[in-house]
Regions:
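Flavin-dependent oxidoreductases
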Residues: 94-180
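Flavin-binding catalytic cores
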Residues: 148-152, 193-232
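A short, glycine/Asx- and small/polar-enriched loop/turn
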Residues: 18-21, 48-55, 96-103, 112, ...
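General small-molecule cofactor/ligand-binding pocket signal
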Residues: 38-40, 85-87, 226-229
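C-terminal catalytic lobe of FAD-dependent flavoproteins
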Residues: 213-296
Length: 296
């Protein structure tokens, strides 16, 4: 894929002096499995960053950035060449997911029948489970994209940065020398509530965007003229054990779900794609037990 994939170092840090030993242990654990990283402390490496920290793990090849739009296009095109059929503008408005054959009704009132349906619509899939007691927690995460900056002074190698808070704040550069910062999460108690359905210019959303801009300016005072270019927010779903939900649900026996909820959605989605493919092929992978619905 010509998606400008670029390896980047990453920095996980804490400002809590009580967590210095934890960061040291984390660094040793990463090194033990072959990850090229080192422990930074305020005494040894504070000059690498313009914001204060007590300790952190600096992984030299621990992350990467890509052009996600181009990657998605290339991925679809690659699979079309292998026989995948893609139907754009096909909104499903009704369904019957029986165990023998699944029937989907489109917005244009066409009928699609299939032996199996795989649902991997991310947070939108929660609509399928509104009748259940929630097995997840919801929050809304905010992010801003700045206008391109002239330099990254006070920011070692323009690495990807994440703090150790829960919820956490992250920062990363873009290929065009802009900055993305995300965080300032708001908890959601009700899918029909205000926070769950707010628009981009909701007063509370604007407040969170402003907080993010203030934070990046405080962290990097040597970077001049940091200004917001655009902003966005979205739902974030977590689970009690931090693991995704992959496989079949008892209410929808004609469907598979690949819901990469939790703290590692990209990896979970890849695992789900592999396991579901194996199950459809009749291989019955035992790992599906780990990610099943109704596990707690």
């Amino acid at each position: 894929s010509n998606c400008d994939f670029t390896f980047k170092p990453c920095f996980l840090y804490t400002q809590d002096p009580r967590k210095v030993d934890y960061m040291a242990d984390e660094c040793k654990s990463r090194q033990a499995i072959g990850i090229h990283c080192e422990l930074f402390t305020s005494e040894t490496h504070q000059n690498e960053f313009s914001f204060n920290f007590e300790a952190g793990v600096y992984s030299h090849y621990g992350a990467a950035i890509i052009n996600p739009v181009q990657f998605t296009r290339d991925l679809i095109e690659y699979n079309v060449k292998k026989g995948l059929q893609v139907f754009e503008n096909t909104n499903i408005v009704d369904y019957n997911l029986s165990s023998r054959q699944s029937v989907l009704i489109t917005e244009q009132e066409f009928t699609i029948t299939a032996d199996k349906v795989i649902i991997c619509t991310g947070y939108d899939a929660l609509e399928w489970f509104k009748h259940e007691k929630p097995f997840y927690t919801l929050s809304r995460r905010f992010a801003i994209l700045t206008k391109p900056v002239e330099n990254f002074h006070g920011w070692k190698e323009a690495c990807i940065i994440r703090d150790d808070q829960d919820p956490y704040t992250y920062l990363r550069p873009t290929l065009s020398n802009s900055i993305i910062i995300g965080g300032e999460d708001l908890e959601i108690d009700d899918l029909d509530g205000e926070v769950a359905n707010m628009g981009d210019r909701h007063p509370l959303a604007l407040q969170q965007y402003h907080q993010l801009l203030r934070r990046v300016r405080r962290m990097f005072p040597q970077i001049e003229n940091i200004k917001t270019d655009c902003w966005f927010h979205g739902l974030f779903v977590d689970t009690k054990d931090g693991l995704p939900f992959i496989g079949k649900h008892p209410d929808y026996p004609g469907a598979y779900f690949n819901l990469g909820y939790g703290s590692n959605g990209i990896l979970y989605s890849l695992i789900g794609a592999k396991l579901i493919s194996q199950d459809v092929a009749g291989k019955n992978p035992k790992e599906l037990e780990i990610f099943k619905f109704n596990r707690y």
